[in-house]
Amino acid sequence: MFTLKKSLLLLFFLGTISLSLCEQERSAEDEGEVIEEEVKRGFMDTAKNVAKNVAVTLLDKLKCKITGGC
């Protein structure tokens, strides 16, 4: 009976460790996805800001040519 308890306790302990390692691995994979989404979002914001600045510059040059006041 004592040997059976020891082996069951050992199996429970090993199963708990295995489950813990799986959860850590899963959370590490999830963090990678979040970082990737943040990078994509950051790239899109940068591209939007560059396009906005180019448009403003072009409009200023066009206004300058039309009015002739530069």
UniProtKB/Swiss-Prot annotation:
Residues 1-22 form the signal peptide. Residues 23-39 form a propeptide. It comes from Odorrana ishikawae. Keywords: Amphibian defense peptide, Antibiotic, Antimicrobial, Cleavage on pair of basic residues, Disulfide bond, Fungicide, Secreted, Signal. Disulfide bonds join 64-70. This is Palustrin-2ISa. Transmembrane segments: none annotated. Belongs to the frog skin active peptide (FSAP) family. Brevinin subfamily. Expressed by the skin glands. One of its GO terms (cellular component) is extracellular region. The keyword Signal applies. Has antimicrobial activity against Gram-negative bacterium E.coli ATCC 8739 (MIC=100 ug), against Gram positive bacteria S.aureus ATCC 6538 (MIC=25 ug), methicillin-resistant S.aureus ATCC 43300 (MIC=100 ug), B.subtilis ATCC 6633 (MIC=12.5 ug) and against fungus C.albicans ATCC 90028 (MIC=100 ug).
